C-alpha cells in the first residue's frame, strides 16, 4: 500500500493510536488503512487508527478503527488524545469540547499551559461491565476484580 498522508502517533495510558486529520485530508479505504498502519512489523504500528472529522452534532467527530479494520464505538484514551490533538494543532481554541463518537456525544474539558494541552478531563459516563456487551471470554455476567494469572504473577482486573 502506498499513500501520502499526514498523521500523528500519540500514546495515552498505554494505548497508542495513529491520528489523522480527516478535515483537511481525504482519507479512503478506512478498514484497509487501519489494518496497514496498525501493523507493528511492516508499518507504523499501533492499537488502531483514529480519524478526526467534522461533525454536525458536536465540535468534532472521532472515528476509531481497531487493528483488524473494524470500527469501534469509543475509547476514552483515544478520546482524550483527540482533545489534545485538535487544540495543539490549532483546529480549535475552545477548552470545552463535545466530540461525536459511535458511542454517543462525549464531553472534554482541557487544561492549557503555555499554549498546549496539559490535562484533559473526559466525562464518558458510567462504565459498562456487562460481559455480553464487551468482549470478555467468561461465563460471568460481570468481570470485576477477577484474578488473572500472567506468567507467574496474578493480577486482579476489571473488564
Features from the language model and the residues they span:
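Active-site proximal loop and beta-alpha junction motif in alpha/beta enzyme cores
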Residues: 1-74, 79-159
Amino acid at each position: 500500500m502506498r499513500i501520502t498522508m499526514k498523521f500523528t502517533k500519540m500514546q495515552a495510558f498505554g494505548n497508542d493510536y495513529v491520528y489523522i486529520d480527516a478535515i483537511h485530508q481525504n482519507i479512503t479505504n478506512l478498514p484497509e488503512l487501519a489494518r496497514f498502519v496498525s501493523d507493528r512489523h511492516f508499518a507504523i504500528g499501533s492499537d488502531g487508527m483514529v480519524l478526526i472529522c467534522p461533525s454536525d452534532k458536536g465540535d468534532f467527530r472521532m472515528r476509531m478503527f481497531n487493528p483488524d479494520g473494524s470500527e469501534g464505538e469509543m475509547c476514552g484514551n483515544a478520546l482524550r488524545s483527540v482533545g489534545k490533538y485538535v487544540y495543539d494543532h490549532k483546529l480549535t481554541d475552545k477548552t470545552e469540547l463535545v466530540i461525536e463518537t459511535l458511542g454517543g456525544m462525549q464531553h472534554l474539558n482541557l487544561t492549557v499551559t503555555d499554549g498546549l494541552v496539559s490535562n484533559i478531563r473526559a466525562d464518558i459516563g458510567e462504565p459498562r461491565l456487562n460481559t455480553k456487551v464487551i468482549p470478555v471470554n467468561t461465563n460471568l455476567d460481570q468481570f470485576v476484580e477477577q484474578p488473572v494469572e500472567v506468567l507467574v504473577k496474578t493480577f486482579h482486573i476489571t473488564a
